[in-house]
C-alpha cells in the first residue's frame, strides 16, 4: 500500500483506492466540491442552531459528503481529512451527531481494526473510517453508553460499528438514505426515551416492573394476567397475548422448540405469550399449531426469542424486554447486525448486496 501526498491530504493506492495517476483528479474533484459547498452556503442564510436554515446547511454538508463518496473511498478519505471535526446532526436518535474524523487521529481504533470489522460482513468489502457518532444528551436509566463509528464501503453502503455490541450494523444503501433513517438499524440504541407510542409504554410498564423484581415475580405476573393483550410496535396492528405457553409446549409441531430452548438456558425460560401475524387474537383452538401464531419466550438473561415453527428454530427479537418493547417483531423479519462472536439465534443478516446467505 503506497501513499501519495496531494496537497493537504493523502491518497492511498490499493484495493479500491486512488492511484498516483488519479491523485490530481481527486484533488480537482475536492476543489469542485468545495466550490459547490460555498455556493450552497451562500444561498442559505445564517440562523440559530436548530432553525430550518441551520438544518438546511447541515443537509448541504451531508449532500457534499454523499457526493464525494460517489467518487470512491480515496476522495472520501481526503474529504474527511480536510473537514475533520465537522459536526453533522443525525436524524435519529435525537441529540446524536456524526463528527468527521480520520482513523489516524482516533484514540481507540487503528486502521487494522477497520480491516478486522470488514470480516464481520457476509461479503468481502472494503470499509473506510468516516468518523464517530456522538450523543450530546444525558443517558436515561435504560440507556447504556455506546462507542459507535461510521463506516462507508467501497460501494457506498453505510455501516456502524458499536464496540459494546462487538458488531457492525448495516445502516443504509448510501448517505442520502442514511440522512432519512439515521441509526435506526442499531437495535441497542432503541429505548423508552425514543419510543413515540405512549400506548405501548403504558401496557409494557407493569411487565417491565415485574421483570425487575425477578424471574419468579415475572412468572406470577404472566399467570395472573393470562389472556391480556399488549400492543406491539411492529408489525403494525399486532398484539402480544400473555400466556405461559403450556399449550405450545404440549403441541406436536413446535413443542420440542420450547423444550430445546429451556435445555439451552438451563430451564430458566418463561413463556411470555403469542403474537398472531394475521391479527386474530382468539385463544388457541386448533389441533395443529398455526405457523403464523408466533410464541414468544424470555430467558433468564432478559433476551426475548420468537419460536419460528415454519423454520423449526427460535430467533432473537430483543436483547432485553426494553428492546422488544421498542422493536416488536422487527428482528424476526429483518436483521442488520453482523456480529463477530455470537448471533447463533439471530435471523440470517440481510446482505447489503442482496445475496442469499444461509
Curated annotation (Swiss-Prot):
<dbReference type="InterPro" id="IPR003360">
    <property type="entry name" value="US22-like"/>
</dbReference>
<keyword id="KW-0920">Virion tegument</keyword>
<dbReference type="Pfam" id="PF02393">
    <property type="entry name" value="US22"/>
</dbReference>
<dbReference type="GO" id="GO:0019033">
    <property type="term" value="C:viral tegument"/>
</dbReference>
<comment type="similarity">
    <text>Belongs to the herpesviridae US22 family.</text>
</comment>
<dbReference type="GO" id="GO:0072517">
    <property type="term" value="C:host cell viral assembly compartment"/>
</dbReference>
<keyword id="KW-0946">Virion</keyword>
<protein>
    <recommendedName>
        <fullName>Tegument protein UL24</fullName>
    </recommendedName>
</protein>
Amino acid at each position: 500500500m503506497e501513499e501519495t501526498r496531494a496537497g493537504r491530504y493523502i491518497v492511498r493506492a490499493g484495493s479500491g483506492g486512488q492511484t498516483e495517476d488519479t491523485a490530481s483528479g481527486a484533488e480537482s474533484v475536492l476543489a469542485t466540491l468545495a466550490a459547490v459547498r460555498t455556493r450552497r452556503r451562500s444561498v442559505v442564510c445564517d440562523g440559530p442552531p436548530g432553525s430550518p436554515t441551520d438544518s438546511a446547511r447541515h443537509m448541504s454538508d451531508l449532500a457534499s459528503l454523499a457526493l464525494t463518496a460517489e467518487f470512491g473511498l480515496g476522495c472520501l478519505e481526503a474529504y474527511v481529512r480536510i473537514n475533520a471535526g465537522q459536526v453533522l446532526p443525525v436524524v435519529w436518535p435525537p441529540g446524536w451527531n456524526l463528527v468527521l474524523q480520520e482513523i489516524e487521529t482516533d484514540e481507540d481504533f487503528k486502521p487494522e481494526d477497520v480491516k478486522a470489522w470488514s470480516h464481520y460482513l457476509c461479503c468481502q468489502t472494503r470499509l473506510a473510517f468516516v468518523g464517530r457518532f456522538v450523543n450530546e444528551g444525558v443517558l436515561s436509566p435504560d440507556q447504556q453508553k455506546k462507542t459507535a463509528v461510521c463506516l462507508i464501503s467501497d460501494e457506498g453502503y453505510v455501516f456502524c460499528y458499536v464496540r459494546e455490541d462487538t458488531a457492525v450494523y448495516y445502516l443504509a444503501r448510501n448517505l442520502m438514505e442514511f440522512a432519512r433513517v439515521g441509526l435506526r438499524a442499531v437495535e441497542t440504541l432503541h429505548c423508552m426515551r425514543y419510543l413515540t407510542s405512549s400506548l405501548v409504554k403504558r401496557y409494557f410498564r407493569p411487565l417491565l416492573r415485574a421483570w425487575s423484581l425477578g424471574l419468579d415475580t415475572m412468572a406470577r405476573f404472566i399467570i395472573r394476567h393470562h389472556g391480556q393483550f399488549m400492543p406491539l410496535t411492529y408489525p403494525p396492528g399486532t398484539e402480544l397475548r400473555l400466556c405461559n405457553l403450556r399449550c405450545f409446549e404440549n403441541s406436536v409441531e413446535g413443542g420440542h422448540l420450547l423444550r430445546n430452548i429451556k435445555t439451552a438456558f438451563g430451564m430458566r425460560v418463561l413463556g411470555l405469550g403469542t403474537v398472531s401475524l394475521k391479527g386474530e387474537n382468539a385463544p388457541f383452538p386448533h389441533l395443529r399449531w398455526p405457523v403464523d401464531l408466533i410464541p414468544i419466550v424470555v430467558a433468564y438473561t432478559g433476551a426475548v426469542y420468537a419460536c419460528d415453527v415454519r423454520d423449526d428454530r427460535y430467533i432473537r427479537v430483543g436483547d432485553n424486554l426494553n428492546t422488544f418493547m421498542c422493536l416488536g417483531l422487527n428482528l424476526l423479519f429483518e436483521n442488520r447486525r453482523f456480529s463477530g462472536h455470537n448471533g447463533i439465534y439471530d435471523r440470517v443478516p440481510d446482505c447489503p448486496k442482496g445475496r442469499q446467505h444461509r
